[in-house]
Structure formats: structure tokens, C-alpha cells
Amino acid sequence: MLPVVVVHGGAGHIPKERTEESTIGVKEAARTGYAILQRGGSAVDAVVEAVALMETNPRFNAGRGSVLNIKGEVEMDALVMDGRTLDSGAVSAVRRIANPVQLARLVMEKTKHLCLTAEGASKFARSMGVPEVPEESLITDYAKMRWKKNLEPDANPVECQMGKMGTVGAVAVDMDGNIACATSTGGMINKMEGRVGDTPCVGCGGYADNKIGAVSPTGHGEAIMKVTLSRLVLFHMEQGKTPEEASDLALAYMKERVDGLGGVVVVDHNGTWAARFSSLQMSWAAAQQGKLHFGLFHGDHFTEPVEEHT
């Protein structure tokens, strides 16, 4: 069953003209992570590189392509967690960084802290030799259009949010049985300056534990934080539920308790995986035993050989 990597490209409503690109993006990310695992790379390597690839893809709400805050600026959050040691690293409200997930990994590996935020994260990035990029390089025309649309007096905030909840994430188990997760996001459209969501919060925006499994979620950050969604999924798995059952229970609780929609990708320590969501759509892909699994709508489960490129 090992190794395995599962990725998501965000939950919500994906406009028709972007569905194919979103699916291609998650498939490529899963292939990238799986290739690392096949070469004997670690689960941490796999999830970080899979997520970094999606951060560079302007079709996702992470890195380049991130949504804009109320001032029209990009502020990003990211998390990495190593299930072997329970070490984690995160950055929040970080600016002008092309790959926040890689900076989060540096926080995990080079500091005694779990999370650095805003200017402190920027100073740390500079000390690590991580280059700053011009903010304009992270802003797409699509993000600008959504920002302007949401500023209009008659804007439907629910419609605008559901159209771009595209947090990206990955979970993996490597050949040694070690588990990891990574999540990255630009956050909510037109959020207040300095708003931080679930993504960089351990137990909310991700969790990994070799004894149980790993989760990376997507959806409405405030709802995910209220129910500590990632740890809730793993709690159900500790009680003997499968990854799929645990995901469905946790997502149903979030909907019932705080009216929150979202999705998760999950693995357990045996390599059993799930990609489940309560939102309209979630682009996801998984690679295991030479097969690439992927989908977008409820009920989707397509497969093709991992090495087959579209």
C-alpha cells in the first residue's frame, strides 16, 4: 500500500472554465509527490514539493494566484507537519514569498518555534536566504477581478467566498511508514488585513501523527478552526473509523454545528486514503501503487497510470 500521496486543490465552487485546469494541477502535484516517494524521499519532502507546485500554479488560491485582502494585497498562510516527531512549522500573513510552504518547513527545521507571522516571518525568510518576490508577481488578473467584484455594494459574499476557497494541501506516507501533511492558502477574498485562518494552526489546517494518520483540509477557515477539523478527523480514526468514515463524520459535524462547508484529504498509517468534501466540489488526486486517482464532483473517481501525462 505504501507509498501514497493525496492532494487537494480546494473546496467550493470552481467555475466551469477553470475545472479542467484545476484537475490537471492536482494530478501533476500528486505525480510530483509520488515520484519523490518512489525515489525513497520522505513524506515531508513529498507534501512540501506537491504543495509548492500548486503554489506556483496561478489557478489555485496559494502562492501565485492567492486571493487579495480588503486592501488588494496578498497575505498567505502555510503549515507543514512531520508525523514522525510531531514537529511542525507554519507562517501566517506572510507577504512577497513565492512558496510559503517551503518557508514553513524552514520554521520547522531551523527554529524552536511552530509559527512565525507577518514581518517576523519576512525577517526570518531573509535570514534564510529566501528571496522576496514583487507582490505583483503573485497577483493574477482573476484575483483582481474577484477582489473588485466583492467590493461592489451588491456583492454576494457567500457566492464570492465559495468561488475561491482554493486552499491547497497534501498528505503522504513514505516507504518507511512516516507520515506528513502540508497546507497553503491565500485565505479569504477581501479579508481584513492581518486575518489569519485555519491553515497555519496545528490541528485545524492540518495534522500528522505516525500513530494515526494525516489530514489536510480546505473550506471556510473560521468554521474549520471552531471544530479543529483536522484533529477531529484523526480522533474518529483513533476510535476505529476508516479515513472515509472519519472524514464524513467530521465534515457532517462542522456543517451541523457551525454551518461550515469544506473538504479533507486523509491517509492512515497503513496507506488507506480518502478525499471527502461537503462543498459543491473539491479537486483532488491520489497516487498509489502506480495508479493516479482523481476527481472533482461528488461521486467522481477516475484512474489512470501515474506515468500517463495529459
Curated annotation (Swiss-Prot):
Localisation per UniProt entry: Cytoplasm
EC annotation from Swiss-Prot or TrEMBL: 3.4.19.5, 3.5.1.1
Family: Belongs to the Ntn-hydrolase family.
Post-translational modification: Cleaved into an alpha and beta chain by autocatalysis; this activates the enzyme. The N-terminal residue of the beta subunit is responsible for the nucleophile hydrolase activity.
Top-level taxonomy: Eukaryota, Metazoa, Chordata, Craniata, Vertebrata
Main location: cytoplasm
Enzyme class: hydrolase
The protein, known as: Isoaspartyl peptidase/L-asparaginase
Catalytic activity: L-asparagine + H2O = L-aspartate + NH4(+); Cleavage of a beta-linked Asp residue from the N-terminus of a polypeptide
One GO cellular component term: cytoplasm
Swiss-Prot/TrEMBL GO biological process terms: asparagine catabolic process via L-aspartate; proteolysis
Keywords: Autocatalytic cleavage, Cytoplasm, Hydrolase, Protease
Primary role: Has both L-asparaginase and beta-aspartyl peptidase activity. Does not have aspartylglucosaminidase activity and is inactive toward GlcNAc-L-Asn. Likewise, has no activity toward glutamine.
Residues annotated as transmembrane: none
Subunit structure, interactors included: Heterodimer of an alpha and beta chain produced by autocleavage.
Organism the protein comes from: Danio rerio (Zebrafish)
InterPro entries: ASRGL1_meta (IPR033844), Ntn_hydrolases_N (IPR029055), Peptidase_T2 (IPR000246)
Binding site for substrate: R195, V196, G197, D198, T218, G219, H220, G221
Gene null: resulting phenotype: Abnormal and deformed fish at 6 dpf.
Active site: T167
GO terms for MF: asparaginase activity; beta-aspartyl-peptidase activity
